[in-house]
Amino acid sequence: MKLDLKKDHNYQNGIYDFMAGTKSIVVANKEIDIEVDYAWDYASDPVITPTIIHEWKYLDKLVSKNVLKNARSILSIGGGGSSRTHEYLSPVTQEFTILNTGMWDLVNAQIPIETINTYLICATGEDMPILDSQIDAIEIPATLDHVIDARKVIEECYRVLNGGGKIGITLGNSDSWYRKVVSNLRIQVTSNHDHHHNFHFTSKDVENLLSEVGFTEVKTIGTAYLKLPKTIERKMKAPVLLAAHRFISNTMLRLLFGNSKGGMFLTYAMKPTAR
Ligand SMILES: C[S@@+](CC[C@H](N)C(=O)[O-])C[C@H]1O[C@@H](n2cnc3c(N)ncnc32)[C@H](O)[C@@H]1O
């Protein structure tokens, strides 16, 4: 993987910092602040239940199977911190790059085994300091709703991917069946954390974005269909209960509701090979 080292940067403590104090991006004549202070360790957040963590692991497995498999060079945009991608890398992976605007995620990033070259880059997904056609697979884990210019990020992904390379985007779904029920019944929900989201995507929005930029074979897998009261979810720690929860959530209810109505989703696609 070749970095664009002509761009201004510092290299310190194993991190390439290309932000050099950049704090905002201008989109449509509006200056918008970049998220640089994200720092969330879910393990110490009481609202995160065993079932939520189990759902995240399931989504990670889907990314591994549908996006990262057979990729020699992998880029994670918004990874690091509590992300567990290092556990799901393909045996053929030789390079793993984490690009994030936040130093906390980079400093606390879990590094894979040392035979895999790991790059930590502080930069925006909108302007990646990576030369063209360097990467086999990109994951954007729960991050596209945090960026400022989602289309620019997807265009940058297209640029740095090799032909035949894959992209996978995971997100909470603004069009999930239970969010609709909650909003129709006007039930007050206390948010599970105070992260700021610039966008609230549906899987259709992400599919359209990928197609517009030129990606093909765009597919979505919906996940996390089952939501129980927190008091019950907190008690579901036994592996057999979690397995039953996953079966109902991601097999039975997915069959019932279809791929676009889960609480979370993975949308993945391919950059076509040049003809
Ligand atoms: C919900 S977090 C993703 C998961 C996170 N790694 C964790 O462990 O929880 C969203 C991430 O997006 C990063 N981010 C925000 N704006 C970004 C941008 N424009 N380009 C790249 N990363 C960005 C934040 O720093 C944050 O780490």
PLM regions and their residue ranges:
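A short glycine-rich, Lys/Arg-flanked "PGG" loop and its adjoining helix->strand segment in the class I
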Residues: 151-166
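Short catalytic micro-motifs in class I SAM-dependent methyltransferases
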Residues: 142-146
